[in-house]
From Swiss-Prot:
PROSITE patterns: HSP70_1, HSP70_2, HSP70_3. Pfam families: HSP70 (PF00012). Belongs to the heat shock protein 70 family. Keywords: ATP-binding, Nucleotide-binding, Stress response. This is Heat shock 70 kDa protein 4. It comes from Trypanosoma brucei brucei. GO terms for biological process: response to heat. Residues 637-648 have a biased composition (Gly residues). Residues 637-661 are annotated as: Disordered.
Amino acid sequence: MTYEGAIGIDLGTTYSCVGVWQNERVEIIANDQGNRTTPSYVAFTDSERLIGDAAKNQVAMNPTNTVFDAKRLIGRKFSDSVVQSDMKHWPFKVVTKGDDKPVIQVQFRGETKTFNPEEISSMVLLKMKEVAESYLGKQVAKAVVTVPAYFNDSQRQATKDAGTIAGLEVLRIINEPTAAAIAYGLDKADEGKERNVLIFDLGGGTFDVTLLTIDGGIFEVKATNGDTHLGGEDFDNRLVAHFTEEFKRKNKGKDLSSNLRALRRLRTACERAKRTLSSAAQATIEIDALFENIDFQATITRARFEELCGDLFRGTLQPVERVLQDAKMDKRAVHDVVLVGGSTRIPKVMQLVSDFFGGKELNKSINPDEAVXYGAAVQAFILTGGKSKQTEGLLLLDVAPLTLGIETAGGVMTALIKRNTTIPTKKSQIFSTYSDNQPGVHIQVFEGERTMTKDCHLLGTFDLSGIPPAPRGVPQIEVTFDLDANGILSVSAEEKGTGKRNQIVITNDKGRLSKADIERMVSDAAKYEAEDKAHVXXIDAKNGLENYAFSMKNTINDPNVAGKLDDADKNAVTTAVEEALRWLNDNQEASLEEYNHRQKELEGVCAPILSKMYQGMGGGDGPGGMPEGMPGGMPGGMPGGMGGGMGGAAASSGPKVEEVD
């Protein structure tokens, strides 16, 4: 059965979160580990693919095949300086196939595989979709997905593609700080007075500042700014560099940075220390046998951490100044400063923001980890026609984060849509030819704030040909920019004399996936999902066989039962059980069919013997004859109860040792 509504997903750099509107409120949904946020990690092993907590938990053992930070790659080029500098910190391998698109290379089931960042993000989205499905008990087909407000066109489009690959219809891409503003403002919508709210959103990998006015149910974004490459991970990097140097100093120049496992263990400890420093004045790192069997112990004070990251912390104030300038608003006119994102728990960050606003008390009324998904879930509810007293009259007016325009003679950037224009929007302008009898024009679309296109980001190009011969400046070419509510752009050009027109949806020809790529990835995703399910089914069958074998062993060793079995029967069961356990030990990665076959063989030996014993005891011919099942402590009566094969009874009863974390 398919869920009629839609879910809201906060697809984060380091953690993701999913919510749904239920019973007049947003429910943030916990995953199978009971956590309300899920690590944005995907791991590939010799036998399976792991997503979320399971992937992050094994990262130290498998650093080169555990992928995270896909959001720092999505919609970017391999040659991008940001990508090149990040690659120095990642244990997994990022390569390009010659088209300047970054792909992630891993070993999976004994083969070398490459994945696009969109595919990795789609796996995280798939995990969030499954978390929602197990809560709702229905299939989910639609979602609202959030992105940093400062994401450019190609990053937005790539995020939308990731949703498609995960089998989701992405109803809307919304900006994270705007989603957080909904979470903050939903219960204040009926206060009736206009409030200027600044959302300061510092997460694991991205940073956004958005200034909006909330008036009744109308959320109008005035300006937005940020850095798509600043967050908690950058603070972790500073700590890792600091402790790597300290290790070198204490251990005669030994450099652990060449050892990926040591580096990963150090990074995990640094992340923990950073969190500790938000509430304590100092933190201690202790790692046994970190590198070349040397134990490492070190302490760091909050003051030292603040010094290490001081420039990054102070750098967060520039976007705050820029949004106030863009909105032409004095900082004293801001009523509320709302903190979002886990990194805003850092005391120094709070202090800097508070001081900037003249010692203002910061608003911490919303959960910084969950606010974005909360807002996405509200928007998902509205977009699927949901009606509630709380959301009626809610209107989101977001803006374009960057100026959009075309290149004109001399490489000049001519703007059609200025940054911070409310979206959706449509703007047209008339251009002409540069030389006499020019048969066509080459239209290049850019985004950015600089006056020359060489300093801006090229989004895409197209040609308008078939212009009749005419002196320069005579033909009239109307260029129209249409920016939709997702912040995705389409551009058209029409020659007024002939009515000739051409258009493109900016799909960032160089960086985007083609339709064929997306279709291939959708089918790959389905294949991997089927393999995951088959792997789980094989593990269940293995556990089932093991449970059955051990419960048989316990049963025949139970004094109440042992006396009722003759030696030949007892030996037959013992031999069959020992043989099954020996086979299990040697075949940890067998197929579902093999496990089921072994189970049937074992049942074939044990069931008739136990049945005969039952009848001898006057217990009827089934497992229900004796109160509480059999005295040997067999789970749920007799597993595999005669003839029915081992269905779910023993397989699902009681905890399975293999699943304990």
